[in-house]
C-alpha cells in the first residue's frame, strides 16, 4: 500500500482528498490528512482516509508523519511551503504543491536529487494545467513552425448555466485571500520583443478581450511573470509571450475600483474594525470618517453618475 500525506484540510484539499479516496482501492492508497482542524473528516469519514490533528509549526511532529509516506502533498498557504520542502529534501520525500516555484525553494533542487526524491510545484490549474496544455501545443507544432507569439489564458469561472450567479459572476473555489491579492505583485510579459511591466494600479486597466466559441467574450489580464517561462517553454526566440487570467466581462473595471479604494490592501488595518458596520469600515479606511453618504463619496471619487 502506498501512503500519501496531505497537508491542509481546506476547500481545495477536500476536493483532492475525496478524489483520492475514490481511487484508493484501485491504486492501493492510504491517505493521511494532517491539519490543525480535521473535524470534518472525523464526522464525515472517507474510505482509506486517516485524519490527523497536527500543528504544522511543530516540525518534529510534522517530520514523524512524513517518515512512512511515499508522497507529501502540501495544500497549505504558499508561505509555508519552504519549511515543508526543507524537511522533504532532508529525509528524501517526494513533494507536490500547486503553488508557484520560488527562488528560495528552487535552491533545494540538488538536495532533492541527492536523496533520489522529486519536487513538483505549479501542479494546480493555474499554474499547472495551463503549463501542460501549453507544452502539448508547442510540442505538437514542433520544429516545423516558427512561433512568433504565444498567449495563454486560464480562469476558474462559473459555467454559463450556473445557479450561483452573483453580480461579480464569480465564485471562490480556492484560497480567497489569493483571489483578493491577485495582481498585487504587478506583472511582466513580452510583447513584440519588448518587456512590458505593469504595476498593481495598471493591471486591471489593461485587458484583452478573448472570444471563446460557444461561450462568448471574456476579459484577460496579465498574470504575474510571463518572462520566466521563455526558457521553460523553450520559446527563447519568440516575439510575444503572455500568460493571462480569464474573467467575465466587467470584472476587471469593477475590481479596479476595489484596488483604488484600498480594500484589497492587506498591509494596513482599521482599529476595532470587527465592531464596525461595512458602511463605517469603508468610511474609516477610505474616507477618513467623512460624514457624507458613502454612495455619494464613492460616486464623487470615481466620477460615477
Locate predicted features:
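NAD(P)-binding Rossmann-fold cofactor-contacting core
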Residues: 29-43
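Rossmann-fold NAD(P)-binding glycine/threonine-rich loop
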Residues: 99-121
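ADP-ribose/adenylate-binding Rossmann-like module
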Residues: 77, 87-105
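Conserved Rossmann-fold cofactor-binding substructure of NAD(P)-dependent oxidoreductases
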Residues: 56-68
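Hydrophobic/small residue at the entry helix of a nucleotide-binding pocket
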Residues: 12
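C-terminal catalytic/substrate-binding lobe primarily of soluble NAD(P)-dependent oxidoreductases
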Residues: 140-305
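Rossmann-fold cofactor-recognition segment
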Residues: 46-58
Amino acid at each position: 500500500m502506498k501512503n500519501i500525506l496531505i497537508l491542509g484540510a481546506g476547500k481545495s484539499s477536500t476536493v483532492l482528498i475525496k478524489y483520492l479516496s475514490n481511487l484508493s482501492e484501485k491504486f492501493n492508497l492510504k491517505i493521511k490528512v494532517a491539519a490543525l482542524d480535521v473535524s470534518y473528516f472525523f464526522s464525515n469519514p472517507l474510505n482509506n482516509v486517516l485524519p490527523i490533528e497536527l500543528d504544522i509549526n511543530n516540525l518534529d511532529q510534522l517530520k514523524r508523519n512524513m517518515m512512512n509516506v511515499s508522497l507529501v502533498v502540501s495544500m497549505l498557504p504558499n508561505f509555508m511551503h519552504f519549511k515543508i520542502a526543507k524537511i522533504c529534501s532532508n529525509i528524501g520525500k517526494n513533494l507536490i504543491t500547486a503553488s508557484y516555484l520560488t527562488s528560495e525553494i528552487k535552491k533545494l533542487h540538488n538536495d532533492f536529487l541527492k536523496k533520489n526524491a522529486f519536487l513538483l510545484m505549479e501542479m494546480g490549474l493555474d499554474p499547472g494545467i495551463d503549463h501542460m496544455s501549453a507544452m502539448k501545443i508547442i510540442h505538437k507544432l514542433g520544429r516545423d513552425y516558427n512561433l512568433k507569439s504565444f498567449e495563454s489564458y486560464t480562469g476558474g469561472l462559473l459555467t454559463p448555466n450556473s445557479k450561483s450567479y452573483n453580480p461579480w459572476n464569480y465564485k471562490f473555489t480556492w484560497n480567497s485571500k489569493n483571489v483578493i491579492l491577485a495582481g498585487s505583485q504587478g506583472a511582466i510579459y513580452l510583447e513584440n520583443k519588448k518587456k512590458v511591466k505593469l504595476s498593481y494600479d495598471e493591471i486591471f486597466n489593461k485587458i484583452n478581450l478573448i472570444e471563446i466559441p460557444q461561450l462568448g467574450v471574456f476579459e484577460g489580464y496579465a498574470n504575474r511573470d510571463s518572462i520566466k517561462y521563455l526558457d521553460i517553454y523553450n520559446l527563447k526566440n519568440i516575439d510575444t509571450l503572455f500568460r493571462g487570467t480569464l474573467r467575465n466581462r466587467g470584472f476587471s473595471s469593477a475590481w479596479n475600483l476595489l484596488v483604488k479604494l484600498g480594500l484589497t490592501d492587506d498591509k494596513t488595518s482599521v482599529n476595532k474594525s470587527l465592531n464596525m458596520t461595512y458602511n463605517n469600515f469603508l468610511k474609516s479606511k477610505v474616507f477618513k470618517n467623512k460624514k457624507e453618504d458613502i454612495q455619494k463619496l464613492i460616486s464623487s471619487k470615481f466620477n460615477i453618475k
